[in-house]
A protein has these predicted regions:
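Residue-level signal for secondary-structure boundary sites
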Residues: 16-18, 62-64, 98-101
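An amphipathic, aromatic/His-enriched active-site/gating alpha helix that lines ligand/cofactor pockets
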Residues: 26-39, 57-91
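Short, surface-exposed ligand-recognition loops at beta-strand->loop->(often short) alpha-helix junctions
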Residues: 11-22
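Glycine-rich beta-strand-turn "strand-cap" elements at beta-sheet edges
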Residues: 1-5, 38-50, 76-101
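Short, well-ordered beta-strand segments in beta-rich or mixed alpha/beta enzyme
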Residues: 3-10, 40-70
């Protein structure tokens, strides 16, 4: 069973980039305890002060979907969405190859 990866690109409302970044910290304990969670990253654009990208990795699509369908995750997402200028662009996939040190 391959790991599930989701990337999402977001455009923060003007002046809300740090609030978007901070919002990711609000649910860290819940996320860490989620079954199958491996890692999450948040990246800011070097070119656009309002653009943020994030990625999350779970050990399976099943565990990712269970987390996504959890009401606590839904509430967290609604809080995030309130800080964004529009809906995120999503990319869901299966880990095909990885290189790490």
């Amino acid at each position: 069973m391959a790991d599930h990866i989701t990337f999402f690109r977001m455009k923060a409302q003007p002046g809300k980039r740090q609030a978007v970044i901070d919002h990711f910290a609000q649910d860290e304990e819940f996320t860490r305890e989620s079954k199958g969670f491996v890692r999450a990253i948040v990246v800011t654009s070097s070119d656009d002060p309002d653009e943020v990208m994030a990625g999350v990795r779970f050990d399976s699509t099943e565990n990712y979907n269970a987390n996504s369908n959890d009401p606590q995750t839904g509430a967290w997402y609604q809080g995030l969405r309130a800080l964004l200028a529009s809906d995120p662009d999503w990319f869901n996939g299966t880990l095909a190859r990885e290189l790490s040190r």
